[in-house]
Amino acid sequence: SNFSNASKENSIEMYRNSLKNLQTDYIDYYLLHSLSGIEAFNQRFGDTGIMDFLQEERKAGRIRNLGFSFHGDAAGFEKLMELHEKYHWDFVQIQLNYVDWTHASGRNANAEYLQAELDKRGIQSIIMEPLLGGRLSKVPQHIADRLKERNPQGSVASWAFRVAGTHPGVLTVLSGMTYMEHLQDNVSTYSPLVPLTEDELAFLEETAELM
């Protein structure tokens, strides 16, 4: 939930309103929105008592799985992982695609590192930005030609979705879709998913370096 700087009382009210609006007495996956490190966590959830409340809700069964989405560097992620022993993260939402795997922009941590840290602890991941904001469905022509030569039947976007779905620690992949053909392509890619081979993963790593 994106509680921002709301008070504990207002945050609890928003949470209870969510249950009411969803017409349910429990939530399967409850997410702390957009954490970048321990400072952001403490300011919004740790020092405010909100995290203690959410843990009690999970203990009572009204939250089935509790996690967070991450946007930040490796140092920030490491600090949040240190909280796993205390809070037991059930899942973490990370940005993962074949560019960000080892070529994340700015100070953002590489997806390879993030997924490996989650795997070490047995924490499932939810994948956001599998198409890097749509960039990996609208690649330069020389990249599209390279992908089509390797797999003439697959769409350009399907390569990115297969990357996101190949890793065994992935729980689900988020996809923003605008048109029916996007939905049809996604369904075709994942029904059933054909995991990428090591050779194909190496091919995509080379492709990312060409972008």
What are these regions (language model features)?
Residues 86-88, 113-211:
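Structured C-terminal cap/extension of enzyme domains
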